[in-house]
Amino acid sequence: MLRIAIAKGRLMDSLINYLDAIEFTTLSETLKNRERQLLLSVDNIECILVKGSDVPIYVEQGIADIGIVGSDILDERHYNVNNLLNMPFGACHFAVAAKPETTNYRKIATSYVHTAETYFKSKGIDVELIKLNGSVELACVVDMVDGIVDIVQTGTTLKANGLVEKQHISDINARLITNKAAYFKKSQLIEQFIRSLEVSIANA
């Protein structure tokens, strides 16, 4: 049995679409037909569905053998896992966004403090970072901050709130990670699963 931690939300939707495209229907249908279950089984695979930021923790602690998670999570802090593969879905990017007329930044709201701090330091810009856990756009709309650092996929949410993308910071994609011990103990199962996803270690 191979246990896989999968990030709920947008990334899981992208995974399901990818599984459909490669006709890995047993897994895609299981994920589609979930109701409120957080633990699902199909064939020799057990899926645990968790918040994205918790995926590497479940893998690191050995509860899950494999994790599928956005690189944004892995960039925020170090986890003792094998960061194994780029996955061909879940593409988006980090960006600085603000009101169209904004040209200077003193305060920035973000859920991704490390990414924001690294970016502004690289530009020689001294900003105050305010950590929020959701709806960071609102902080800019009500003028609590001058701008935000957030994940952008289509830009629809920014546009709906009167914000525009100012700077592209870095690309984000889905990553496949493994528990370090499981990578050796369950190497055949892990390699079989990777083959079933039609990706290669060359994508690392």
Swiss-Prot record:
The lineage's top-level taxon is Bacteria
Q: What class of enzyme is it?
A: transferase
SUPFAM superfamilies found in the cross-reference section:
Periplasmic binding protein-like II
Report the subcellular localization.
Cytoplasm
Principal localisation: cytoplasm
Q: Name one GO molecular function term.
A: ATP phosphoribosyltransferase activity
E.C. number(s) listed in UniProt = 2.4.2.17
Q: Which reaction does it catalyse?
A: 1-(5-phospho-beta-D-ribosyl)-ATP + diphosphate = 5-phospho-alpha-D-ribose 1-diphosphate + ATP
Q: Which GO terms describe its cellular component?
A: cytoplasm
| Matches recorded under CDD domains | PBP2_HisGs
**Which pathway does it serve?**
Amino-acid biosynthesis; L-histidine biosynthesis; L-histidine from 5-phospho-alpha-D-ribose 1-diphosphate: step 1/9
* Key words, A-Z: Amino-acid biosynthesis, ATP-binding, Cytoplasm, Glycosyltransferase, Histidine biosynthesis, Nucleotide-binding, Transferase
Q: Which GO terms describe its biological process?
A: L-histidine biosynthetic process
| Protein family (similarity comment) | Belongs to the ATP phosphoribosyltransferase family. Short subfamily.
Q: Which PANTHER family match?
A: ATP PHOSPHORIBOSYLTRANSFERASE, ATP PHOSPHORIBOSYLTRANSFERASE ATP-PRTASE
Q: How does it assemble?
A: Heteromultimer composed of HisG and HisZ subunits.
Q: What is known of its domains?
A: Lacks the C-terminal regulatory region which is replaced by HisZ.
Q: Tell me, in a sentence or two, what this protein's role is.
A: Catalyzes the condensation of ATP and 5-phosphoribose 1-diphosphate to form N'-(5'-phosphoribosyl)-ATP (PR-ATP). Has a crucial role in the pathway because the rate of histidine biosynthesis seems to be controlled primarily by regulation of HisG enzymatic activity.
Q: What protein name does the entry list?
A: ATP phosphoribosyltransferase
Protein source organism: Staphylococcus aureus (strain MRSA252)
Name the gene behind this protein. hisG
